[in-house]
Amino acid sequence: MPDLKTMMLNFGPQHPAAHGVLRLVLEMDGEVIERADPHIGLLHRGTEKLIEHKTYLQALPYFDRLDYVSPMSQEHAYSLCVEKLLQCEVPIRAKYLRVLFCELTRILNHLLNVSSQALDVGAMTPLLWLFEEREKILEFYERASGARFHAAYIRPGGIAADVPEDLIEDIAKFIEQFPKYIDDVDELLTENRIWKQRTVGISEISIKQALDWGFSGPMLRAAGLAWDLRKSQPYEIYDQLDFDIPIGQNGDCYDRYLVRMAEIRQSISLVKQCIEKMPEGQIKTEDRKISPPSRAEMKKSMEALIHHFKLYSEGYHVPEGEAYAVVEAPKGEFGVYIVSDGTNRPYRCRIRAPGFAHLQALDFMAKGHMLADVAAIIGSLDIVFGEIDR
């Protein structure tokens, strides 16, 4: 009897469930996947090299364009890294506003993931409901920074500008009525028979396997390990806030969905706490080598105007050394490593994207599953190619 040959199938990069520009070469035995080979690099823009040719402030907007569905988390990691090199202390109000917007960013990210994962397996309604809520959060982004996506709001030394007076009030109102929309999606999906058939038991992964592959964030927590940098290595003011770490049991697509839904609820609680505890005060460091003089000062003093111009054209010089900062981004641990040679530009910047580690395990996770399950698996990984290809 002749040997049966496996079939090669190209999934993407134009496929709607590829979540961007993923080209997946599948080796298939009938409908069953023998091997899945992700081809990356179609969105490579050389970000790390571009950063070497920019000042520390000019490099910041590149981070918005990595994981472009949760931009402020990336800015946060970069700002913390530069602040480590500068040994700069950030005012307490700026810390609260940073955490407030990072948690809104987490909600923004998980809303997109849950709705698009549901769409990938055929549930259209959550996308229509949740995009309306995302739009409201993007409006808060716009009112704070002037941009819906590429905010450049969290900067080394603090934040770009204080929030408008009524914005905190509007966020509080939104957070009050928002949980009912999450309850609606919960009701629609969590116990839905078809949803469970498509996600329960698909690409199960143990804690050991997750750690071996370098998983972090919801991917690791869904496997059952309560590892969250906001608790285990607290940064900013997370040690003063009260929240739980949701974990899964089986590490399958269904558990990843449950963990993200629970994280949305935890983020709602964190946003409420930030609003309640929000102090008054400065939003930028007083160190004039890093933050510019105020507009009022520039109108009165020629030196202040020159100082402002030099700070934005030439940039500040960062002491020689190296630093690594990592934050609990919505997709996992997002790290930035910077080497400074004492000039106004980074000598080297290395970005640790969580999605890269998750995508490399796709072959391991998809093996033995059906072709139809690939969409469910990719949806549960929560990958964005801006950060994977960099």
From Swiss-Prot:
It catalyses: a quinone + NADH + 5 H(+)(in) = a quinol + NAD(+) + 4 H(+)(out). Its main location: membrane. Its EC number is 7.1.1.-. InterPro entries: NADH_Q_OxRdtase_suD (IPR001135), NADH_UbQ_OxRdtase_49kDa_CS (IPR014029), NDH1_su_D/H (IPR022885), NiFe-Hase_large (IPR029014). It is found in: Cell membrane. PROSITE patterns: COMPLEX1_49K. Disulfide bonds: none annotated. Transmembrane segments: none annotated. One of its GO terms (cellular component) is plasma membrane. It holds the Pfam family Complex1_49kDa. One of its GO terms (molecular function) is NAD binding. Keywords: Cell membrane, Membrane, NAD, Quinone, Translocase, Transport, Ubiquinone. It is a peripheral membrane protein. NCBIfam families: NuoD, PRK06075.1. NDH-1 is composed of 14 different subunits. Subunits NuoB, C, D, E, F, and G constitute the peripheral sector of the complex. Belongs to the complex I 49 kDa subunit family. NDH-1 shuttles electrons from NADH, via FMN and iron-sulfur (Fe-S) centers, to quinones in the respiratory chain. The immediate electron acceptor for the enzyme in this species is believed to be ubiquinone. Couples the redox reaction to proton translocation (for every two electrons transferred, four hydrogen ions are translocated across the cytoplasmic membrane), and thus conserves the redox energy in a proton gradient. This is NADH-quinone oxidoreductase subunit D. It comes from Wolbachia pipientis wMel. The gene is nuoD.
